[in-house]
Amino acid sequence: MEHIQGAWKTLSNGFGFKESVFEGSSCMSPTIVHQFGYQRRASDDGKLSDTSKTSSTMRVYLPNKQRTVVNVRSGMSLHDCLMKSLKVRGLQPECCAVFRLIQDPKGKLRLDWNTDAMSLVGAELQVDFLDHVPLTTHNFVRKTFLKLAFCDICQKFLLNAFRCQTCGYKFHEHCSTKVPTMCVDWSNIRQLLLFPNPNNIEGGSHTLPSLTMRRIGESVRIPVSSQQRYSTPHPFSFSTPSPVSECSLSQRQRSTSTPNVHMVSTTMAVDSRVIEDALRSHSESGSPNNLSPTGWSNAKAPAPTHREKAASSTGQEKNKIRARGQRDSSYYWEIIASEVMLSSRIGSGSFGTVYKGKWHGDVAVKILKVTDPTPEQLQAFRNEVAVLRKTRHVNILLFMGYMTKDNLAIVTQWCEGSSLYYHLHVLDTKFQMFQLIDIARQTAQGMDYLHAKNIIHRDMKSNNIFLHEGLTVKIGDFGLATVKTRWSGSQQVEQLTGSILWMAPEVIRMQDNNPFSFQSDVYSYGIVLYELMTGELPYSHIRDRDQIIFLVGRGGVVPDLSKLYKNCPKAMKRLVADSIKKLRDERPLFPQILSSIELLQHSLPKINRSALEPSLHRAAHTEDISSCALTSTRLPVF
């Protein structure tokens, strides 16, 4: 029991435990780990003089090849005298043993921490680690992090830094003073907590006291960058620790009483899941887990067969834990409905109603016309949101999130400008030809981007094209096939969607299971070009909606191209005619459309700046010269 207490208090110093987990007496294990002890030199023998006896001091050799001299006062125990020296080095007296060095015969005698310190004035003491403490030394290497990584000390970006090959601790060079002294052997800790060995028990059975999750939550502190590093067991090597001088960043060996600044221990991260799993297994078993000091030492050196088995299954365990810990990335794009404040209703369309709202600024909220969505619809909606959230383009409205509570809704950026439909058919804005061509180019550029992402708009029209901050085109209401289709049971059934004036003939006929395609978006874009180049809507002479559906679906009517502006370029007229062809396969795709409009823009005549200087400047220059000539003094001629 004492060994378990000492080990837990050791870990509490490194992991930031605010309160002691165990309460009891000090460790009294007869076993000692000699590899951590201070190696005395021959020159150190006989250095203790009579002055040290008269000054009431003791010389103490500490782990990690350090030493110090402590003052002794009357009434102080050995524990009280050495507490400060051990604390500044990140050590706990409960996990160490103290010995008195004997000169003749040469050896050492184990002392109790409660021994009166006055009886040891002038003596030489040695402090060693107990054998059940699962610690090892770091194995630092310099590493260039090509992938995104952060310092475990300051949480800042890493590029050229250091990393421990054993525990994975990574840090900047200027953060090395805060690196924990000892490397935590996580495989031993996990084996101790989860796989105790009840067969090797000496001196009776010892049980692990129960811990509440409240105390664990209060004591464990997990930095963000360390949550993944210790989330899976690591197959550490169990070789003898190398000397500290080889892994302390090339710092010279300290021989004075001042502690090595590169070895000062600080709060180290620990994954709470390790302790939670141990508590869960402890509570489910119904009987206490038996632990002993021998169990600690056995966990430190497992059998070769066990190590080979653990190494072979490490990949499978890592994949299982990672799969369990991952969360759907679309979860972070879902917005809580109570955080969005709706202000005014902007309008309604074929698939929903648009409101202006407030969510960290002005946003547009489109509440979709889907009542009581089924689990299949919700999953399909989330799948499409996962595609929409990856769209980033200057001519595309920025997708900001979605909502599923009460109603399905999407949140996009707010566009201050009006729609192209409002400019052309309500405000009757008079655009110049080069402005109309530029609007057509930006629209084609945005649609080309969507098609490159395999997103079909399905509702391309002038109402969904917005002029933002001047003449910057923003395309909205794209994608969302889930809400633009009719559901029959758990299957999607295509239905007549969109405004009929911009619908392609094959979409109106609905003869195919999925009539929507890149070419159907091209047809809708062709109608938008017709609006730009005429300032009118197509089929204005037909008043009956059903008649338009019948005639367009059968191919009996096409937009009247004779109404195009007289100054419309011939290339633009051909592009409008090609985009609204009856046969789907005869229409061009947006890469071809975009290149055609860009060539047209370059061929348009431009007003070049005159190379002549302004006459005002020349007149002023001439006036200055003439004034100088008039004011010049003429010398008399003799």
UniProtKB/Swiss-Prot annotation:
Carrying Phosphothreonine, the residues are 266
Please state the gene responsible for encoding this protein: raf1
Which GO biological process annotations does it have?
A: MAPK cascade
Q: Under the GO molecular function aspect, what terms does this record hold? A: ATP binding; MAP kinase kinase kinase activity; protein serine kinase activity; zinc ion binding
The annotated regions of Polar residues compositional bias extend over 284-297
User: Which taxonomic lineage does the organism of this UniProt entry have?
Assistant: Eukaryota, Metazoa, Chordata, Craniata, Vertebrata
Q: What is its EC number?
A: 2.7.11.1
Which residues are annotated as active site?
459 (proton acceptor)
Q: Where does ATP bind?
A: 346-354, 366
Q: Gene Ontology terms, cellular component aspect? A: cytoplasm; cytosol; mitochondrion; plasma membrane
Descriptive protein name? RAF proto-oncogene serine/threonine-protein kinase
